[in-house]
């Protein structure tokens, strides 16, 4: 840390750090708090910012006030991103919980997103196992296990074969 940087108030340094973190991608409030509290890697190793709890609260409040930090926007974008990568609703819920998002906010966003989880599960299965999907029991079990690992619900997985049989 240079001498001019060390003389800057902790609040200004935290605000600068928050802006840099949020410029890369959206974060949940809990993620941002964790990253702000982590030591900064400097030329001489990890360096702490000697900020008070009030400084952290002011930075978080400023980010909320100016629209840089919005948990509902983060949740919506996170759900869209993870579903595009082929993950199901159970896995997405778990990851959002780990990121400090409340269950209510997660459920609200899951209801508002317009994603056909059954179609997404079928796409993942055909991408991995090819078309047509196997009907042999042992192969079906492999596909079910794969989709459960990806976070799909059993009802969506079973619908793949119900719709396939029609």
Swiss-Prot record:
It is found in: Cytoplasm. It comes from the Bacteria. InterPro entries: RecX_HTH_2nd, RecX_HTH_3rd, Regulatory_RecX, WH-like_DNA-bd_sf. One of its GO terms (cellular component) is cytoplasm. Keywords: Cytoplasm. Its main location: cytoplasm. Disulfide bonds: none annotated. The keyword Cytoplasm applies. One of its GO terms (biological process) is regulation of DNA repair. Modulates RecA activity. Belongs to the RecX family. HAMAP family: RecX. PANTHER family: REGULATORY PROTEIN RECX FAMILY PROTEIN. This is Regulatory protein RecX.
